[in-house]
Amino acid sequence: MKKWSRHLLAAGALALGMSAAHASDNDTLYFYNWTEYVPPGLLEQFTKETGIKVIYSTYESNETMYAKLKTYKDGAYDLVVPSTYYVDKMRKEGMIQKIDKSKLTNFHNLDPEMLNKPFDPNNDYSVPYIWGATAIGVNSDAIDPKTITSWADLWKPEYKNSLLLTDDAREVFQMALRKLGYSGNTTDPKEIEAAYEELKKLMPNVAAFNSDNPANPYMEGEVNLGMVWNGSAFVARQAGTPLEVVWPKEGGIFWMDSLAIPANAKNKEGALKLINFLLRPDVAKEVAETIGYPTPNLAARKLLSPEVANDKSLYPDAQTISKGEWQNDVGDASAIYEEYYQKLKAGR
């Protein structure tokens, strides 16, 4: 999840409707989601339409959500929103259950291009909610975007101490692995080490790591080039910063946040109703406009303004998407990535 939006929503626990202590399993739904990921008033609308009260709480990372589900095994949550390879990880570990798509009458609204990704073939365990990508950010007032075509351009010596990288081990290594011609999902220790050695060469060019909002350093004039999330770049442009998105020839880094039902959910039927509600075009449009990231809902996209719907940084064409790579679970190799990443940052 790439967390920055036009609006700041309340974090932590938010109870909508009556207390869980006085609610039965079927008329209360426990929804655990990313901070800033639901527009104000939307869950109240769901409650008004269905009678199901939503107990809403938020998290800041997949790791936090995963640990909470591992800790509370008594069905503490009915709906969660894991990202890309966490869907893969959680389905393999039996933490999320198969979704009865016959009860999702709005499933057909989803863009076929956003379905059947490697982390969940056939979407048996997850339903796309929001997606996005990491690409190259360029301040067009300082650098001609036409001169930047590849991840390799970030290694050029003229950009010493002027780049921004996202503070994300998998993303940073995926960039280097793609530059070297390897898969960004490799589990080969030698390939990961090669990426580490390549990234060491990049460090003199790096001015900052940022995953709170990678667009901020661009907006504040601290950097003019580097990695950026396409949604935050779009919002930055709307705020007046000429932050262009360049899709590198090696391919962008794609991610998706999906709706999933924990294996021990107590209100599966309520979760399915909320998923179906969130798949409505009018609702998905509101979510996308609030968050500032692309919606996988094709019917909702048709409701967006032409300025947004036709923006190629938000909605790249099929060829650009096909060149990119979706992150998959790398199992035990994640520890190797993290070890090298910490060494990389410590050695700056």
From Swiss-Prot:
Q: Where in the cell is it found?
A: Periplasm
Signal sequence: where? Answer: 1-23
- Tell me the Gene3D superfamilies matching this sequence: Periplasmic binding protein-like II
From which residue to which does any coiled coil extend?
Answer: none
- State if tRNA-binding is listed as a keyword: no
InterPro entries hit by this protein:
SBP, Sperm_putr-bd
The UniProt entry's GO biological process terms, in alphabetical order, are:
polyamine transport
Give the stretches traversing the membrane.
Answer: none
Q: Which keywords does this chain's UniProt record carry? A: Periplasm, Signal, Transport
Give the principal location in a single coarse category: periplasm
Please list the GO terms describing molecular function: polyamine binding
Q: What domain of life does the native source organism fall in?
A: Bacteria
Q: Can you quote a single GO CC term?
A: outer membrane-bounded periplasmic space
Matching NCBIfam families, A to Z? PRK09501.1 (NF007048)
Task: State the protein's purpose.
Answer: Required for the activity of the bacterial periplasmic transport system of putrescine and spermidine. Polyamine binding protein.
UniProt record similarity statement = Belongs to the bacterial solute-binding protein PotD/PotF family.
Name the UniProt record assigns to this protein: Spermidine/putrescine-binding periplasmic protein
